[in-house]
């Protein structure tokens, strides 16, 4: 009997243990971040359970309300938003919350305040619920500058100021991927234990990938560099093999695949939507943060994505993120266009 192998299998690194280990590396830590993360994890577990039994519980119909993006809200959207708002406030470690579902930011009452601001999309890709496609929760965490004088400026910061970011994908398995600024790690939910277990330690995106991910239905409205890049993916002139197109339409699922297999995920601006569709604070920033931490890049068509300074909490931006070399290629096309302008 291989006792060493058995020991490896039984020495499970849970997400709580992992975050506590990270905390021990920082002498100034008082455990606030660990408590906050445990509440985010609780929210993810609740939503995972709700997504898994959505059909049985009749949660997947439209709720009859419209969110501020003008999208019909699904019942699961509403439920997920409420769960995360309550979980984050009850942690006692948050100050300002920005949700994709709420028009205004939520300022936590002073007696329950902590030093963190959390920006999140409680259920990204919700239009895919009915057809069983993977959906997910995306979150980013900032530190408040002055706890006694918290303002919207505390969340209207560039993404490079985030202290942590992550997403939880609800699919064939429930996977939580996060970074606290020192690499990216992935955890898979074990339903028998009720715990997230470290299954993807220190994720590194391949330097170059074989996949591109974009909604080609918008191609007629694209700008020059995006059109040229996709043409290059399909019909390479250097004798290399064409890239494969993979597009699910759920950002969490598309980015998760890109992170693990390499390649590029694109949601460019176009004639119809010059700023693209993705929201800066709780979609572009967290995913860009993760990509950079995994050794990739994120670019808006004009600048590094994490250098953007949002003016409003629901601002949108184009984004190109993924393998370092693939993003370099599209950056070169934008630079050439600017030079010729």
Swiss-Prot record:
Chief location bin: cytoplasm
A single GO cellular-component term on record: cytosol
Binding site for Mg(2+) 1: 71, 100
Cofactor binding: number and manner: Binds 3 Mg(2+) ions per subunit.
GO biological process: fructose 1,6-bisphosphate metabolic process; fructose 6-phosphate metabolic process; fructose metabolic process; gluconeogenesis; sucrose biosynthetic process
Any Pfam family the entry gives: FBPase_C
Superkingdom as given in the UniProt entry: Eukaryota
Catalysed reactions, as listed in the record: beta-D-fructose 1,6-bisphosphate + H2O = beta-D-fructose 6-phosphate + phosphate
Localization terms from the record: Cytoplasm
Binding site for Mg(2+) 3: 121, 124, 283
Residues binding Mg(2+) 2, per UniProt: 100, 121, 123
Named cofactor requirement(s): Mg(2+)
Assigned keywords, A-Z: Carbohydrate metabolism, Cytoplasm, Hydrolase, Magnesium, Metal-binding
InterPro entries, sorted: FBPase_C_dom, FBPase_class-1, FBPase_N, FBPtase, Fructose_bisphosphatase_AS
Binding site for substrate: 124-127, 215, 247, 267, 277
EC number annotated for this UniProt entry: 3.1.3.11
Top-level enzyme category: hydrolase
Extra remark: In plants there are two FBPase isozymes: one in the cytosol and the other in the chloroplast.
Designated name of the protein: Fructose-1,6-bisphosphatase, cytosolic
Originating organism: Beta vulgaris (Sugar beet)
